Amino acid sequence: MTNIRKTHPLMKIVNNAFIDLPAPSNISSWWNFGSLLGICLILQILTGLFLAMHYTSDTMTAFSSVTHICRDVNYGWIIRYMHANGASMFFICLFLHVGRGLYYGSYTFLETWNIGVILLFTVMATAFVGYVLPWGQMSFWGATVITNLLSAIPYIGTNLVEWIWGGFSVDKATLTRFFAFHFILPFIIAALAMVHLLFLHETGSNNPTGIPSNADKIPFHPYYTIKDILGILLLILSLMLLVLFAPDLLGDPDNYTPANPLNTPPHIKPEWYFLFAYAILRSIPNKLGGVLALVSSILILILMPLLHTSKQRSMMFRPFSQCLFWILVADLLTLTWIGGQPVEYPFITIGQIASIMYFLIILVLMPITSTIENNLLKW
């Protein structure tokens, strides 16, 4: 008798994706982040569901309902902080996952990569609308500032902003629709993630060398299931350390003040995971230019396959490209730091230099370096 997991229509899908999947024998821990992102998404959907049971999306009661969750609901505080810090863990895994893709040339799987970029945008949109829901000062002003950026679009900008707001300012209608978006988007993310996986399994995984590994495959289970479980345990450990010992470490103190349209906070800034893009936005004095730079900073990922000039797929055997990659990482960390600083000298200048460096490395220096490395291979 054939095993049920290989014959049953539903079990067969699971089997081919997580059990009998042929995987390269040499993929490192950098390949753990896909499964970690899946765990993050499940965790966020579950904690979010329980929060939604007690949350009210009305400007008069939203802030109080979050306070009520923390004070009166059984284990409400841990659910709330797991959800808030879970978002941070989600983005840490996302950035490392994208970084792995850049380093090892995984972007040559075009469909997988492009759906990944769409996923990144969707997760960022979800995090943004979610940040508005507690209706604190930073929620309100963050929503006002970021939605206002759309007014930079010529001709239709102002109408578009008012259409998104549902009025002439961020108000009750805005909060209600943002809650609706925040509830639906994670399910869209889950669907996109399945398509992401579908396209990945058409080609099979890349590996650190960037060399086809068809001659040397091992079954996903037990080798990579046990490896993923280790990653998941480390993820949950770090998340719970954050939640139980420093729940407000990554948050903004201003968000413990209820939203007040008459009082602007001295420094409006988004959550830490958007600071690099925020720094790029602020480093251009022109509004439309800033918005274009902001969008380009993420959209540039779609160009990665076109900018790949190397004869080798991975950076494993390309020391010059490796140097550039780590300079890019340092540059992004610099931008993240600048995004959280006030708009004054010397931060403005540092931000502008870091922003120019970001685009210069990706668009100019990396392709040139790859071409030089190709020529060095002839020696």
UniProtKB/Swiss-Prot annotation:
Q: Where does heme b b562 bind?
A: 83, 182
User: What cofactor does its activity depend on?
Assistant: heme b
So where does heme b b566 get bound? 97, 196
Please verify whether the record's keywords include Metal-binding: yes
Keyword Transferase applies: no
- Any binding details for the cofactor? Binds 2 heme b groups non-covalently.
| Molecular function per GO | metal ion binding; ubiquinol-cytochrome-c reductase activity
Pfam families, A to Z:
Cytochrom_B_C, Cytochrome_B
Q: Enumerate the subcellular locations listed in this protein's record, separating them with semicolons.
A: Mitochondrion inner membrane
Question: Which chain regions cross the lipid bilayer?
Answer: 33-53, 77-98, 113-133, 178-198, 226-246, 288-308, 320-340, 347-367
What Gene3D superfamilies does this protein map onto?
Cytochrome Bc1 Complex, Chain C
Q: Residues that bind a ubiquinone, according to the entry?
A: 201
Q: Single Gene Ontology BP term?
A: mitochondrial electron transport, ubiquinol to cytochrome c
A single GO cellular-component term from the record reads: mitochondrial inner membrane
Q: Which SUPFAM superfamilies match?
A: a domain/subunit of cytochrome bc1 complex (Ubiquinol-cytochrome c reductase), Transmembrane di-heme cytochromes
Q: Which family does it belong to?
A: Belongs to the cytochrome b family.
Leftover remarks = Heme 1 (or BL or b562) is low-potential and absorbs at about 562 nm, and heme 2 (or BH or b566) is high-potential and absorbs at about 566 nm.
Q: How does it assemble?
A: The cytochrome bc1 complex contains 11 subunits: 3 respiratory subunits (MT-CYB, CYC1 and UQCRFS1), 2 core proteins (UQCRC1 and UQCRC2) and 6 low-molecular weight proteins (UQCRH/QCR6, UQCRB/QCR7, UQCRQ/QCR8, UQCR10/QCR9, UQCR11/QCR10 and a cleavage product of UQCRFS1). This cytochrome bc1 complex then forms a dimer.
Q: What does this protein do?
A: Component of the ubiquinol-cytochrome c reductase complex (complex III or cytochrome b-c1 complex) that is part of the mitochondrial respiratory chain. The b-c1 complex mediates electron transfer from ubiquinol to cytochrome c. Contributes to the generation of a proton gradient across the mitochondrial membrane that is then used for ATP synthesis.
Question: What name has this protein been given in UniProt?
Answer: Cytochrome b
What organism is recorded for this protein? Capreolus pygargus
